[in-house]
Amino acid sequence: MSGQENHDHGRISSTPAAASEPSKAAAHSSDYAPYPKLDPTDVTPPPPQPIPTGAAATTMPAESNPYVSPSPAPRNTMDSVKDTLGKWGKMAADATKKAEDLAGNFWQHLKTGPSVADAAVSRIAQGTKILAEGGYEKVFKQTFDCLPDEKLLKTYACYLSTSAGPVLGVMYLSTHKLAFSSDNPLSYKEGEQTLWSYYKVVLPANQLKAVNPSTSRVNTSDKYIQVISIDNHEFWFMGFVTYESAVKSLQEAVQSHGP
């Protein structure tokens, strides 16, 4: 499928994270799927609950959602991530002690995942990647199929709620779409093999129906944004560093492009 045609229908084809991909069997059974089949409960998930320690996703959630598009990653990617976590673990631990003195959403963003240190390291790694590759605009266009005149408007570090747990990544808002990509690849099974894939969501701007901010009744510092497509698929985002700005930008996108 071409990039432009896919954007019109809310679907994009996955783009490999590396030149090489795992070899696939020559023949498959009739119920074969390249990644776990969708769980109907994940199409319209309930409002997120407070996330217990250790709940962040490391495996690919089962999705039937037309806006979800996994993107294969090399098998050794997670090994590199683990090596980085090991090398930077002590530095991250020291940094998070100082982070306790910081107010507002950034600390809440770090606490959304199972490990403050891991979240901090992921943010550092993501920032390094952005700098190395020439900024968010270039990373956005490398990660997603974009139209020639498409411009990136905003980016937000956040988590996406899934049936497998919250997924840490970056939300991208452009002139043509709302998109999300995980910072790290998630694992999934293909036969006996464990493979890795980045978790991506793409909603064309003209498919946005509503954006609803909400706050947890249990802990008012837990804030969420519910995004609904015109065909009633729901996505719950949380752990924003700049929550108010994200709400404002998303609601403006609905007003500009929505039905």
From Swiss-Prot:
Pfam family, one: GRAM
Transmembrane intervals: none
Region annotation Disordered: where it falls in the sequence: 1-79
Bias type Low complexity, positions: 13-30
A GO CC annotation given for this chain: nucleus
Disulphide bond pairs: none
Gene3D superfamilies registered for this protein in UniProt: Pleckstrin-homology domain (PH domain)/Phosphotyrosine-binding domain (PTB) (2.30.29.30)
Basic and acidic residues: bias regions: 1-11
Domain GRAM: 138-215
Family of the protein in this entry: Belongs to the GEM family.
Subunit and interaction comment: Interacts with AFH1.
Official protein name in the record: GEM-like protein 1
Organism of provenance: Arabidopsis thaliana
Gene: FIP1
